[in-house]
Design a protein with these regions (language model features):
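Gly/Ser/Thr-enriched, mixed-charge loops and adjacent short helices
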Residues: 2, 13, 111-127
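Short alpha-helical interface elements
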Residues: 8, 35, 91-95, 102, ...
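Ferredoxin-reductase
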Residues: 43-119
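General structural signal for secondary-structure boundaries
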Residues: 23, 84, 124-127
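An N-terminal, well-structured beta->alpha segment
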Residues: 1-68, 72-73
Length: 127
């Protein structure tokens, strides 16, 4: 599956050729861009970002990359672990976080991943 980038996130297959799939480097780049975007609305503030995921095999690995990148960018991370998309969105509000990242599969296919980037005032992002 070709890497798909949209306003609400990224979608791609884990594994395979780097130019055609979602790679760890892609995950780092998109996570870093998200932190920079959120930081623009809160200059000088230490950000708090919620991370949630579904039970797909690749979700834990992707979550580890995202969490490490967020920490490397100076953000605090609230890892809610296995959690539904609405549950992760609610956790952003409950933890008074600045945003959230949801790691979930699309269409139920193994290896296909969507990272939805959630600003704190968002309702629900659907792709």
């Amino acid at each position: 599956m070709t890497l798909i980038k949209s306003i609400s996130g990224i979608r791609g297959t884990i594994g395979g050729p780097a130019t055609e799939n979602l790679t760890p480097l892609d995950i780092v780049k998109f996570t870093t861009a998200y932190v920079r975007f959120i930081a623009e609305s809160a200059p000088g503030k230490r950000l708090k970002i919620v991370v949630g995921r579904d039970a797909r095999i690749s979700g834990e690995m992707v979550g580890d990359i995202i969490e490490g990148t967020l920490l490397g960018c100076g953000a605090d991370v609230v890892n809610v672990g296995l959690c539904t998309t609405p549950g992760t969105e609610l956790a952003v509000t409950a933890h008074r976080a600045d945003g959230g990242i949801i790691i979930t599969a699309s269409l139920g296919l193994l290896g296909v991943l969507l990272n939805a980037f959630v600003p704190k005032n968002a309702f629900e992002i659907v792709m």
